[in-house]
Amino acid sequence: MSNVRSDKPFVLAGRTFQSRLLVGTGKYRDMEETRLATEASGAEIVTVAVRRTNLGQNAGEPNLLDVLSPEKYTILPNTAGCFDAVEAVRTCRLARELLDGYKSHENRTLVKLEVLADQKTLFPNVIETLKAAEVLVKDGFDVMVYTSDDPIIARQLAEAGCIAVMPLAGLIGTGLGICNPYNLQIILEESKVPVLVDAGVGTASDATIAMEMGCEAVLMNSAIAHAQQPVLMAEAMKHAILAGRMAYLAGRMPKKLYASASSPLEGLIK
């Protein structure tokens, strides 16, 4: 059947990953909880806010890389807290320097770009984001980019050379789930680069829906870290991602207005 979907590898910057769940490292009670939740999630890519997390730039302070080693995880530096292109570019360059000492870290140029518009909504400033993306791509970075759910902006970011677009499902930290599935569907249908949902996931069903729609992966932090039992939620998210991907590949049944009996009517006992 020509419409049967076959699975394909999840590839970023030339590297294949088994897990389609990416996790953040903020908002946990302590580094031990961060470690346990990350392990339970099965994630291979861990994103880190360079401006808020010590990756070695602050000597004498606890270093996250001592807990989540680049020998085990692909560290994805992000530019959280940046409000203009200049700040974001500077932060990415700092991250590259900090990770350069880890020779086993294969993707020192892989970054997650986010440039925020304001503190209240944490919406992306798409104008500054596009400016930063163009500079970073020219500078040799592999840019995964947090963006709005505007399909035109997503297209422009891909055309600028970003290797993945990451539209928000809902506002960062709200747990509202996928607020505009129609725009997300347009992005998925038109994008020539991987599409990952970023921000807004609140529980396992949100992650499953994103994967059922055809997203390559989902990135989350608050949904796990703010759960009553973060480690258990991390494991739930691992299974949610798998279930959603399998359902997408399987193809859901068509929706119908009227009932259709599961058993045939022919041959009924009279």
From Swiss-Prot:
Q: Which Gene3D superfamilies match?
A: Aldolase class I
Briefly state the protein's biological role: Catalyzes the rearrangement of 1-deoxy-D-xylulose 5-phosphate (DXP) to produce the thiazole phosphate moiety of thiamine. Sulfur is provided by the thiocarboxylate moiety of the carrier protein ThiS. In vitro, sulfur can be provided by H(2)S.
Task: Fetch the InterPro entries from UniProt.
Answer: Aldolase_TIM (IPR013785), Thiazole_synthase_ThiG (IPR033983), ThiG (IPR008867)
A GO cellular component annotated for this chain's UniProt record is: cytoplasm
Question: Keyword annotations for this protein?
Answer: Cytoplasm, Schiff base, Thiamine biosynthesis, Transferase
Catalytic function, reaction form? [ThiS sulfur-carrier protein]-C-terminal-Gly-aminoethanethioate + 2-iminoacetate + 1-deoxy-D-xylulose 5-phosphate = [ThiS sulfur-carrier protein]-C-terminal Gly-Gly + 2-[(2R,5Z)-2-carboxy-4-methylthiazol-5(2H)-ylidene]ethyl phosphate + 2 H2O + H(+)
What does the UniProt entry say about where the protein is found? Cytoplasm
Record family assignment: Belongs to the ThiG family.
> Record-annotated residues binding 1-deoxy-D-xylulose 5-phosphate?
173, 199-200, 221-222
Please identify the protein, giving its name as recorded. Answer: Thiazole synthase
A Pfam family that the UniProt record links to this protein: ThiG
Biochemical pathway: Cofactor biosynthesis; thiamine diphosphate biosynthesis
Assembly, per entry: Homotetramer. Forms heterodimers with either ThiH or ThiS.
What superkingdom does the record give?
Bacteria
Record: active site? 112
Q: Which PANTHER family match?
A: THIAZOLE SYNTHASE
Determine if Disulfide bond is one of this entry's keywords. no
